[in-house]
């Protein structure tokens, strides 16, 4: 794995951080009315910026893979940096969340988000399951030191998709109960899959931090990425619990008849229990995320002398914005002033971090021209051409990664008895006869 990771794939993480930050302004813990509504307007501007960046970067990435198909294969086998492809469904999901945040009063917007959700779900499954399976079956053998926080990006898309489902389900419920239940079930299943996957990945990553030397300086910022997964999961499960509690409170019971077989008091008590279960799970996951915030901050402070700005810094914006957004929603639900203040502080930190990365990216990338690069791109293209050449000449295909290996010079001659200019005895006898 290269020491720098300023490739086109990593640029997509800019969209993810921008998209979640605009959600922080939408869910800001203090009432947004009157003059304070400018926060929501800033969030809308960030949402438009995210759409533009998403179209630009995704279009560039698609063009690269269309013109050079070998790069897609090579990138998917480059563990763990191939996990940055997870930024595509993440950004797509935050765009969907923006639609329902700013146009929730429109029926067309509700149905549009419902349709786009299924596209996002398929994209997330391709990354969270397809990419992992591909890495298991095709990537080179890895050492423990190769594991980095970037690997968590394979499971974050499912969490963000669950967040999308939890955000749009109350509005789709206004149009169709069946569609809302479909969102609830599939969104909760995505959340459950993501919980199982992130538990395994984070456990391996934590063991790697203890048992092996610290990651390379450019990859240290990836220590924050577990924060993104856990924070998105916390936000999603609380919103699911609120919707399910409301649904039960309105008279639903599993053995549905009219009137319901359970009393209204029982339904109200059940809905309150479910709501508080969501809050407890939120607190559990956000506490776990807080541990990784402390761990990531400590790692960055210890590596400051070696760190230079690169696109990987955006890997900290997305997790911190997700962390702030989770606290914002929790503080609004519990109506606790202390939590509101903490959530507002985290939003400010995430905003300052976004501004720092944006200014550094503009200065180093567009002014100095020293930021955007694709290390090893020429080598990858050359390797692809060499593989095609070896394939055409009858090279042996390696099963573990699909590449071709040519036999040593003269080996085929030795097998037929013709090495070093000597012919086989069988051939000599034919000529004598």
Predicted regions, residues:
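Intrinsically disordered, low-complexity terminal tails of fungal membrane proteins
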Residues: 1, 377-433
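Membrane-interface helix-loop-helix junctions at boundaries between adjacent transmembrane segments
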Residues: 73-81, 100-156, 166-191, 210-218
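Juxtamembrane membrane-interface segments at transmembrane-helix boundaries in membrane proteins
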Residues: 1-5, 29-44, 72-83, 105-114, ...
